[in-house]
Structure formats: C-alpha cells, structure tokens
From Swiss-Prot:
Domain notes: The VTT domain was previously called the SNARE-assoc domain. As there is no evidence that this domain associates with SNARE proteins, it was renamed as VMP1, TMEM41, and TVP38 (VTT) domain.
Main location: Golgi
Protein name (record): Golgi apparatus membrane protein tvp38
Bilayer topology annotation: Multi-pass membrane protein
The UniProt record lists the keyword Membrane: yes
Amino acid sequence: MPADYASTARALSVSTTSSRSPSPGEGARPLWSQGATDTRTNAGFAARRSTPIPKQGIMARINAFNERSLALWRKMTFWQKVGSVLAVLSLNILGFGFLYITGRVFQWLGPVAEKWEHSVPVFIVMWLGVFFVSFPPLVGWSTFGTVSGFIFGVWKGWLLYASATVLGSICSFIASRTVLSKFVHRLVERDKRFAALALTLKYDGLKLLCMIRLCPLPYSICNGAISTFPTVQPLMYGLATAIISPKLLVPAFIGSRIRILNEKGEEMSLGSKLINIFSIIVSIAAGIFTGWYIYRRTLARAQELEEREREDIRHSLEADHAAHRPQRAFSDDPIVNAAATTLARDEEERIGFNDFDDDNVDLVIDDDDLSSRRSKSPYKDEFTDNESDVFRDGDGTNTDTYTLHTHVRH
C-alpha cells in the first residue's frame, strides 16, 4: 500500500505539459540541435505573437510613440540630450528656411514666368536641373517639379519633369552601381536583411520597384540605394520610374495653381481662391496618403516574399542534409548566389545545421622533405652500428606529420 501511494503521488506530481506528443517537425530535427533551436523558435514565435495589430487606434499609436520617446530620452546622457535638442532645432530652422526661400523663388519667378514659358533655353536648363538632382546626395527634385509646373503649366511642366526624372534615374542608377560595386558585394555577403530584400525583387521585381518608387523616399538617395540591389537592372528601374510618372503630375499641378493665384489673385473671387487653395491641399494630402499606404504595402509584400525565399532555402538545406550531400549552388548568378548563401547561413542557425560535412576525414601529409630524405637514405635490410638507433635517438626533427581533421557537427 505505501508503495502504491508513493507511485501515485509521483505520477500526480508530473506536469501535464511535459507529456504532450512531439510535433512532426520536432521529431525530424536532429537531437543535438533541439535545445538551442527550441529557444530560438520560441523566442521568434513570441516575437511574432507580440507584434502589434495594425488595426489599433490612432490614440493608442500616439501614446505608444510617446512612451518610447520618453524612455529613450531618460536613457540619454546630458550631452546626448543637448545634441538631440540642437538637432531638432536645426531641422526646424532648415525647414522654415526652405519654405521661405521657396516662397521668395516663386515671387521672383512671377514677373518672368510668362516670358519664360515659351523659351527653349529655359526649358533645357530646367530639364538639366531635374536630371542632375537625380544623383545622390543632391536635393531639390520636388522643388524643380513645382517650378516646372509654375513656369510651363501642368502638361508641359509634367513632360519636362517626367522625362528628366526617368533618364536621370537610369544614369544615376548606373553611376551609383559602378561606384558602389564593392560596397554591394560586402553587403550581400554580410547583411542578411539586405540579402533578403535583394532576393525578394526576383519574384515580382517590376511590381515591387513601382511600389518603392511610389513611396515618399528621398529621390536621389533612393536612386543610389536601389542601385545596390544586384537583382535590379537599370532598364527595369527606368521602366518602373516611367510607369509611376503620372504621380509627377501632382507637383506640376500645384505649381500651376500657385501661378494662377499669384497672377490673378486680386481678380479672383473668394470662392475661386478657396477652390484653388483647396485643390492644392487635396493634392498634397492625396500624395502623402498614397505614399504612406504604398509604403505599408511595400513592407508587407517584401516581408511576404522574404518568407517565401527563406522557405525555399530551408527546404533545399533539409534535402541536402537528408541526402548527406554538400550544399549546392542556389543560382548561376554569383551575386544572387552570394545573397542566397547569406540567408542559408542564417537558416542553418535556425534549423540547427552547423556543418554539412558528415564526418569527412581529411588526411594531411606534410611531406615537404619526404622525397629529398628518401634520396639521401636508401632502404636497407641490414642495420649496422654505424647508423643511428631510432629507438635511442627518437624521431628527430624532420619527421612526417599525419594530421587528421574531422568535421564534427555540434
């Protein structure tokens, strides 16, 4: 009876969670990798579960942002706080200064806009201006679009703006890729996030490029950044820029409305002024909302394609490991293969495959002086007293070294 009681107590003390049946994925995983991999898997699962839902209210997002900002502010040292305040003040001063200078530019252009509207040299100068600000780190691309609409009207200004933007983006792309080629190779080999984003563009590259071009990103910096993706070709990038060129009607339209208000503001009725001002505000709001929406969709699509690419690489790694064969190349393109290999190393750590060589034994023979010593010491069947005794003198210094290198999976 006491024995039965003790066994019953031990059975009841066992946690019910420990008796669950392992999933198929856990049973197929190597025993040496379960401990570390389970920790990473659980951490990744918890991180995915803790991701905030995008349908949260605006006030909740604002409160969360305020809390993060306050927490970051409290962690700063005194000089870091001083530097942050100075940086914010500098940005505000630059922003207001840019608005003031832009206003002065339009005031200066007002009297000459009608004369320059049909001038070919002015058209060429404006076109070259838009073309050259395509190269990083130059700025002023949006201002050139508004000025083009101000001087030449909506359609002529858009034609100037769009054509110079497309050709400028292609040339900037080629120049940036030439200059940054070594930087590209280092990023592909070391940064798994960059490698993942580069590989996602091979699925629906044109569609994703169009979405990126619609995002509210700095124009010249975006040209240089996208040129670092090895899977993007210059003509494809130029085609994506041409496809989204209707977006460039917005700054040209705003510039034309500003000219109308500047020239005929005194003659307009209050209703006409309000309509023109309202159209400008709606155009700006539509551009901001569209850019924000496309930016969110672009991030979601890139993450979806990255998961697909990782899944394909994971299946390839598992198949190679199950067949006891070395890892094969993922692509004939060396840069694409380097990016895929970077992701493969990350997937190896997640799965638990630290080495794909299954107990291969390499025999290394250090025989640099082997042939010379053979010629000096021919083989003899008889041993005389004149020769050294190997058991007394030892092996000496010039001996053959046999080293066994065994690759062991941890």
